[in-house]
Every structure is written in structure tokens, then in C-alpha cells.
């Protein structure tokens, strides 16, 4: 008990210092000002399906600088996507990123870095279309890549993620 009280006091002091430092880091100064930027919006497009269309509409409402991004892990999928894009792509540009090792993260991070260089302090919103299956065990089978990408993008400065969910009707 004699040791516990001083240890608790030290822990509480550390926590207090953390909150004071956090408050100082977030405090506005006269030099701070709101600067409107043209946000770039990237809609991840693994394929063209009903879950992607609401994501494209959402992205168009955020900015005039919208691009659909497909990471090429299978050339057959790319050809089908390109064929269907003119009909269903809503006039948005489609950017295809090569991924020789079937990695989603590395090509996307490299492209985000390129986009951020286009304008100083440009924010990038990455829209991740997801479909929500009606049964819990179906959810275990889908959207795992989206979860991994959201986790990686969480630690990228100037990058915001947005999920657009499409709720599937009951399926077998």
C-alpha cells in the first residue's frame, strides 16, 4: 500500500501532463487560419457493381476533383472494368494502378503521395465502397481488404477515409 499510492500519484501526474500538452498542441493561435483547399477524392473501385455506384455519387458531392482508382491485380478484371466504365462510370476518370505483386497498399500509397504533390496542403479523401451482407457470417467473408486499407490509411497525414456502405438484400 505504501508503494501503491506514490505510483498512482505519478501515473496521474503523467496523465495530467499529457492532457496539458495535448491542449497546447490543439490550441489556436493568431497565425492559424482556415484555408480552403481543393480536396482530391479517390474512389477505390475493385470492380464495377451496385456497391460502387453510391460511392461514386458520394464522391462527386465532395469535390470536383474525383477519380476512380482500380488496383490491377488481375488483367482480366481490368479489361472488363474498362469495357463497363464508359456506361457506368459517370464520366469520372478511371486510374489504373499496376500491382505486379498483388499488393493493394503499396501502389495506393504511392499514388496518394503523387496526388498530394499536385497541390500544397491538399487533402486526399479515399472513399472505400463496402457492401454489407445481411448475415453476420457473410460479413466475415467480405470487405477484408477495405479494413486493411483503412488501417494503413489511418496513419497517413492529410488522408481521410470514408466508407460508403451498400446494404445487400437477403441472399442465400
Each PLM stretch: what is its role?
Residues 3-7, 15-172:
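Cytosolic C-terminal regulatory domains/tails of membrane transporters and channels
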Amino acid at each position: 500500500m505504501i508503494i501503491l499510492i506514490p505510483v498512482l500519484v505519478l501515473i496521474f501526474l503523467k496523465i495530467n501532463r499529457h492532457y496539458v500538452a495535448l491542449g497546447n498542441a490543439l490550441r489556436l493561435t493568431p497565425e492559424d487560419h482556415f484555408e480552403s483547399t481543393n480536396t482530391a477524392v479517390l474512389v477505390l473501385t475493385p470492380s464495377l457493381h451496385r456497391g460502387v455506384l453510391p460511392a461514386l455519387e458520394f464522391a462527386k458531392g465532395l469535390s470536383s476533383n474525383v477519380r476512380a482508382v482500380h488496383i490491377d491485380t488481375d488483367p482480366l478484371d481490368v479489361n472488363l472494368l474498362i469495357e463497363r466504365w464508359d456506361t457506368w462510370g459517370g464520366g469520372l476518370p478511371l486510374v489504373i494502378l499496376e500491382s505486379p505483386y498483388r499488393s493493394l497498399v503499396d501502389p495506393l500509397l504511392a499514388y496518394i503521395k503523387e496526388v498530394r504533390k499536385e497541390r500544397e496542403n491538399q487533402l486526399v479523401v479515399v472513399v472505400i465502397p463496402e457492401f454489407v451482407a445481411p448475415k453476420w457470417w457473410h460479413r466475415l467473408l467480405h470487405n477484408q481488404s477495405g479494413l486493411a486499407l483503412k488501417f494503413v490509411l489511418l496513419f497517413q497525414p492529410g488522408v481521410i477515409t470514408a466508407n460508403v456502405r451498400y446494404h445487400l438484400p437477403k441472399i442465400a
